[in-house]
């Protein structure tokens, strides 16, 4: 009888241990980018570090100390590839759930270690130069992942950037402006992504195809012609721009499909590998896709693209 009770106690203990450890493995780990020394920061009491990811949305008043949420791939699946994810939200907020944590878990299923970037949203009240604030955070994020690659079992030459909507603008900015010195780096680690995944991205700041909310939030109401050109990333593609996988829908009323088309054409001009999937429907902001629409097939197309570039091969 005593042995039976003992076995029951052991079973109960193991059950609770599985719950505790299971939860700990499924949760992400936060990595602060700047350790309290954010470049070009202006203190403002109205901006508090009060991120609530339960709602799936983060507003611009909630991020003053940007960070990465790390989602390591399991040892059984890990292939050494990593992706830094930039959620969208018109540079006014961030859809951190369906363009962040849900995407990270999908990447984990592919054996990819994912990092959701909670970047600062541009605002003159907390930044000396709001146009480069998100880029500072993005460059820093890639350098951190590359510097700590061994710790996470990552190949430092297999680190990609991924962005949705305005997060796609940040991702394409990091793909074209990675050599731009927007802060004083601690070392010579490259901030260049090895590949990019751009989903219904804002690419251009040009009047005829930009998303006006994203442009105004990043550059203000009256940007100069030089600023518009500088942050129109289809104009900044060069021979060092990393390969890209892109997705857009023809009926996107928020961000015109021409954003992706122009970027893909610029990539083609420089003979850089680029795959663009244009769907007849889907609109905007669908994350991994809506089950009834054809755009829901993009994750599988992306998987095949990653596979074709040997980014899913276990070593």
Name each region found by the language model.
Residues 1-30:
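Bacterial Sec-dependent N-terminal signal peptides
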Residues 50-55, 201-236, 242:
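Mobile cap/lid helix-loop segments that gate and shape the active-site cleft of serine hydrolases
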Residues 79-88:
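Short beta-strand element of the alpha/beta-hydrolase
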Residues 27-77:
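N-terminal cap/lid segment of alpha/beta-hydrolase-fold proteins
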Residues 140-210, 228:
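Primarily recognizes the serine-hydrolase "nucleophile elbow" in alpha/beta-hydrolase
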Residues 246-248, 252:
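Short beta-strand/loop motif that positions the catalytic acidic residue
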């Amino acid at each position: 009888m005593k042995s039976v009770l003992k076995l029951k106690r052991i079973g109960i203990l193991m059950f609770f241990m599985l719950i505790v450890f299971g939860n700990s493995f499924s949760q992400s780990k936060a990595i602060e980018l700047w350790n309290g020394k954010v470049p070009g920061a202006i203190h403002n009491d109205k901006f508090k570090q009060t991120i609530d990811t339960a709602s799936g949305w983060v507003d611009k008043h909630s991020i003053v100390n940007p960070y990465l949420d790390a989602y390591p791939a399991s040892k059984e699946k890990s292939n050494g590839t990593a992706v830094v994810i930039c959620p969208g939200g018109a540079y006014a907020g961030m859809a951190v759930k369906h363009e962040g944590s849900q995407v990270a878990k999908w990447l984990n299923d592919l054996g990819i270690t994912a990092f959701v970037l909670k970047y600062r949203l541009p605002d003159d009240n907390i930044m000396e130069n709001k146009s480069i604030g998100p880029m500072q955070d993005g460059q820093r994020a890639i350098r951190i992942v590359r510097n700590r690659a061994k710790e996470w079992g990552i190949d430092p030459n297999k680190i990609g950037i991924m962005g949705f909507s305005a997060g796609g603008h940040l991702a394409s900015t990091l793909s074209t402006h990675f050599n731009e010195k927007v802060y004083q780096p601690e070392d010579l680690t490259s901030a260049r992504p090895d590949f990019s995944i751009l989903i219904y991205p804002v690419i251009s700041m040009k009047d005829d195809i930009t998303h006006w909310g994203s442009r105004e939030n990043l550059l203000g109401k009256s940007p100069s012609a030089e600023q518009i050109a500088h942050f129109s990333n289809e104009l900044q593609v060069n021979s060092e721009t990393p390969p890209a996988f892109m997705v857009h829908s023809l009926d996107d009323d928020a961000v015109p499909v021409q954003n992706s088309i122009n970027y893909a054409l610029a990539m083609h001009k420089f003979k850089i590998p680029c795959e663009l999937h244009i769907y007849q429907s889907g609109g905007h902001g669908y994350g991994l896709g809506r089950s009834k629409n054809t755009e829901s097939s993009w994750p599988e197309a992306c998987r095949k693209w990653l596979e074709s570039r040997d980014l899913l091969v276990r070593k």
